[in-house]
């Protein structure tokens, strides 16, 4: 079975993204976009420093690639404390979490990415750690088992998730500072691209940066990746400065259209449009038709299509909008007006 080729515009982390740490902003003042989140964080951080206390636990919610990890690092840097990072799937058992927590010093920041994927048994251990700064561990087995309490330094837990709905209510309620991150505007992405070009020593015209920003799907991680690919074309073509024309040529050859859709997006839209009459159709059916996992569709493909007005999630399934048919150059089918609010179809898998 052939392996699905990697998508250029996926917001998932790829190896090349990890090598560009120097492009990341180091302070809230340097961070572009997410104005409300930055303003609130600056107030909470200043207040915590003035009280000489640990910052309340923070939860970042939003699609991949919007800066959750970067903001977590900035929080630690602005507080002047140590930063430790892990992820939900890595913490397999209570001992793994205990090792992380007992290594923390006063007011340190522990970042848990994909916190919605924590083992339920580990999550139970996390509750008293977040609330009372204590670890309740069971030592031994059977009749000889005993409970041991370990005092922890007062720390800040920063969680990140793309699936807030999968968090249990007890865990979600223990975060005093919930922050939702939004997709970036083209203007914000343009500034990010221009900054990245300066760091890389690449001459980039403003119009060229705008062309890259328009195709970056509202996501800085994708903008950085597109910039690197355009840079490759500039080097091979031997041009001194990246213009809009060069950026358009490079990204068109890479099959990224003027609004950032790629072959996978168009395949998704075409499956619903041509195979299922524009919908509504259930997510499991779409996943089977595309031979893609449901999580990847919900986390990576759909958020941008919804944000662009191409797709609706309804009680009966996924439904393409007239805007999607116009973009695909297809005629919209005549559909009966759905009475979603009256008789919701309980068979939808969402």
Curated annotation (Swiss-Prot):
One term of GO molecular function: ATP hydrolysis activity
Region (Small ATPAse domain (RuvB-S)): 185-255
Purpose of the protein: The RuvA-RuvB-RuvC complex processes Holliday junction (HJ) DNA during genetic recombination and DNA repair, while the RuvA-RuvB complex plays an important role in the rescue of blocked DNA replication forks via replication fork reversal (RFR). RuvA specifically binds to HJ cruciform DNA, conferring on it an open structure. The RuvB hexamer acts as an ATP-dependent pump, pulling dsDNA into and through the RuvAB complex. RuvB forms 2 homohexamers on either side of HJ DNA bound by 1 or 2 RuvA tetramers; 4 subunits per hexamer contact DNA at a time.
Binding site residues for Mg(2+): 69
Recorded domain comment: Has 3 domains, the large (RuvB-L) and small ATPase (RuvB-S) domains and the C-terminal head (RuvB-H) domain. The head domain binds DNA, while the ATPase domains jointly bind ATP, ADP or are empty depending on the state of the subunit in the translocation cycle. During a single DNA translocation step the structure of each domain remains the same, but their relative positions change.
Entry's family note: Belongs to the RuvB family.
Chain positions recorded as DNA binding sites: 294, 313, 318
GO biological process: DNA recombination; DNA repair
Species name: Beijerinckia indica subsp. indica (strain ATCC 9039 / DSM 1715 / NCIMB 8712)
Region feature Head domain (RuvB-H), mapped onto this chain: 258-350
Keywords recorded for this protein, A-Z: ATP-binding, Cytoplasm, DNA damage, DNA recombination, DNA repair, DNA-binding, Hydrolase, Nucleotide-binding
Region of interest (Large ATPase domain (RuvB-L)), residue spans: 1-184
Highest taxon, organism lineage: Bacteria
Cellular-component GO terms for this entry: cytoplasm; Holliday junction resolvase complex
Positions of ATP binding: 23-24, 65, 68-70, 131-133, 174, 184, 221
Entry annotated with the keyword ATP-binding: yes
Known EC number: 3.6.4.-
Subunit relationships: Homohexamer. Forms an RuvA(8)-RuvB(12)-Holliday junction (HJ) complex. HJ DNA is sandwiched between 2 RuvA tetramers; dsDNA enters through RuvA and exits via RuvB. An RuvB hexamer assembles on each DNA strand where it exits the tetramer. Each RuvB hexamer is contacted by two RuvA subunits (via domain III) on 2 adjacent RuvB subunits; this complex drives branch migration. In the full resolvosome a probable DNA-RuvA(4)-RuvB(12)-RuvC(2) complex forms which resolves the HJ.
SUPFAM superfamilies: P-loop containing nucleoside triphosphate hydrolases (SSF52540), Winged helix' DNA-binding domain (SSF46785)
Catalysis: reaction(s): ATP + H2O = ADP + phosphate + H(+)
Keyword ATP-binding recorded: yes
The name this protein goes by in its record: Holliday junction branch migration complex subunit RuvB
Intracellular or extracellular location(s): Cytoplasm
